[in-house]
Structure formats: C-alpha cells, structure tokens
Amino acid sequence: MSGGYPALELSAEDLRLMLAAHVHVGETNMNFQMSTYVHGRTKDNFHIIKLDKTWEKILLSARAIAAIDTASDVFAIGSRPFSQRAVLKFANYTGATAMAGRFTPGAFTNQKQSCFREPRLLVVSDPLSDHQAVMEASSVNVPLIALCNTDSPLTRVDIVIPCNNKSTHSIAVVWWFLAREVRRIRGEDTRLQQWSVLPDLFLYRDPNEEEQNVEDPEDARLEPVIPGADAEAAETWGVEPSMPVGSLGDMGIAAPGYGPVGGTAGGWSNLDADPTETW
C-alpha cells in the first residue's frame, strides 16, 4: 500500500506504539474471513494480527476519507463507552460528524425522523456493537469502514482495519493514526514533522477514577491544622460549659444547672445579669 514510497511505510516508532497498545492482540476465536490478517496464535490461544496489514488498511481508509469533498459527510460511529472519546476526537480533528453513544434506528433510512442523516462514508468502531448502523448503511449503499477484530464478521464491510477493537488503548491508537493520516493526505500537516496531538487525547477516561483523584478545595481548607484536633473537639461536645450562659426564663427555657439571677447590674462585667432595659 505504500507504493514504494518510504514516507508511507510503517516507521519503527509507529510500530512500537502499536505494540505497546496491543493493537496486534486478537481474540481466541477467529472468523474465517479474517484469516488473511492473522499471523498465528500465542500459547494462550490469542490470535496475532499482522500489523503491516493494519497499516496498509489505515492508509487505504485515510485515502477514502480524504476523497470525500465535504468532510462532514463522513460519519464516525462508536456506541461503546470505550470508543466514544476517540470518535469525538477524530471528528474534531478531521471535520467529520461524530455519532457517539446509542445509534438511533432509522437515522439513515427513515426520512420522517428529525435525526435523519445522509452520509457518504461511514466509519464504525466495531461491526458487532454498531450492527444497526452497519445494516442501515448497507441498505442505502453507503461505503463502510470498520475496525475489525479476529472474531468480527465482515459482512457489509467494504474496508477492514484489522486491529484489537476491545482494548481502550488499541482503539485510541488506531483512531489517532487514522486522523493523522487523513490530515496528512489533505495537506493540513506534513510528514516531516511530528503531529502535535498526542494519542493520550483519544484515550478513554473513566469518570469514576477522575472524581476520586480530584480533591475538593473546600474540604482541603476545612482540614485541621493540628493532627488530632478534630478528635479532641468531638470529645468535649457533651461537656457542660464552664461559664453560665445566662438566664433563659424570659424565653420559657430554664438554663440547665443554673437558677434565676437576682443581680441587676449590666455591662460586660456581669454576663449572667438579665437585661434591665428593652431596645
């Protein structure tokens, strides 16, 4: 697929990135149509995907996407939570239309729906989880590009990108490669320089982990400066005050442990005296 051009060949850096993201690790099962993309098996019966085939299909898919005149006519679909962030980032950097989350049935076939769309090219993260979009794209003759694992069916798929579509790192790296090659083919970026966008931006982030890592600044200010100060304060909650709080007879409440005060002197020196004047 590189056509003999060294710039289009798989570099050692990109190969190390694929290996680190486990793009080559498939499933234990294999669809017979995916046998051409499988190199062999591991001792754990996991199939190994040929990364040279993966790179060739990424270049082919990027050329097909770049051939569309209007970038928004390319639809990137990812229904699983692990692929939604990668789909949104791909659409952001290539100008495509992202459909992250649940796909509405009839979005490509029912013209009476408010969400009806007419794409010219479809890119899905998994033909199994996105089967509704795959079926509707086939019904309206829309070309389809799919990230396929070793057990994925290739029915209705026009361009296959063999990769591990179950791993969060693998999904992020493949979508990142696809976005980078589309921008390079369009002339938006050059191959002589590294793309400034890192693959980490395409990686799925667990919202529960982020909430646990973020500390509330209000809670940080309320923490006691002296260790054990909160425990000492809690022990004195049930102790009666050493200073009388004054007579509460006028309010109908008797002060615990103290009788009425007969003194009439006011001022700050006599805190137990009742007020002699009204405001």
UniProtKB/Swiss-Prot annotation:
Location within or outside the cell: Cytoplasm
Keyword Cytoplasm found: yes
Ribonucleoprotein found in the keyword field: yes
InterPro entries in the cross-refs: Ribosomal_uS2, Ribosomal_uS2_CS, Ribosomal_uS2_euk, Ribosomal_uS2_euk/arc, Ribosomal_uS2_flav_dom_sf
PROSITE patterns (UniProt xref): RIBOSOMAL_S2_2 (PS00963)
Transmembrane segments: none
PANTHER family with a match to the protein in the record: 40S RIBOSOMAL PROTEIN SA (PTHR11489)
Family classification: Belongs to the universal ribosomal protein uS2 family.
Oligomeric form and interacting partners: Component of the small ribosomal subunit. Mature ribosomes consist of a small (40S) and a large (60S) subunit. The 40S subunit contains about 33 different proteins and 1 molecule of RNA (18S). The 60S subunit contains about 49 different proteins and 3 molecules of RNA (28S, 5.8S and 5S). Interacts with ribosomal protein S21.
The name this protein goes by in its record: Small ribosomal subunit protein uS2
Species per Swiss-Prot/TrEMBL record: Schistosoma japonicum (Blood fluke)
